[in-house]
Design a protein with these regions (language model features):
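Fe(II)/2-oxoglutarate oxygenase catalytic core
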Residues: 1-148, 154-174
Length: 174
């Protein structure tokens, strides 16, 4: 396969060779390709067909008065692994302070909210045994399944296309 098919896009839109991806991401991608998807969506599901949708955050909230995400204490190993994955996917990238972890979430068109200053470019990757579920950024459809993508979630409208199966996404940001 080619880098365009398997690679990660850097800040300049250049493809990073698949051989440079984190071995764990490559292994997860191969496992997912060998499984068939089951029907699911972000808003309706049948028992055994993907399950409920939801989102939570991990990381460090800015400012002294902000409560830290509960996900940090509920899932410390996941938090550590997710931040390590960001470094493995994009070693050139300034490490993020937060990660949104989403399961079977189908987001409507939106821009991310925040304090309005200092936010970083978002990094997203899709994981799981699903079909569909592409990310649309300013009307351009992007396949993020086991392919990391950087985009400006604070200024660019983005949303999730319908999907079938179990879909996770990790979104790193500051």
């Amino acid at each position: 396969s080619t880098a365009a098919e398997d690679g990660v896009t850097d800040n300049d839109g250049n493809q990073i060779e698949a051989a440079n991806l984190a071995p764990t991401l490559q292994a997860a991608r191969m496992r997912a390709q060998n499984k068939s998807a089951v029907r699911s969506s972000a808003y309706a599901f049948a028992e055994g067909q993907g399950g409920a949708s939801g989102s939570f955050s991990v990381g460090a909230m800015p400012g002294d008065g902000c409560a830290q995400p509960k996900g940090n204490t509920l899932f410390p190993e996941l938090t550590k692994a997710a931040f390590e994955l960001e470094i493995a996917l994009c070693p050139h990238r300034e490490p993020s302070s937060m990660i949104a972890i989403n399961r079977n979430a189908q987001f409507r068109p939106h821009t991310d909210s925040g304090a309005g200053a200092g936010q970083s470019t978002s990094l997203i990757v899709g994981l799981g045994t699903y079909v569909g579920g592409e990310l649309v950024v300013e009307s351009e459809t992007k396949d993020i399944r086991y392919k990391a993508l950087e985009f400006n979630g604070w200024t660019e409208r983005h949303w999730t296309m319908p999907f079938e199966g179990e879909r996770f996404s990790l979104v790193w940001f500051t």
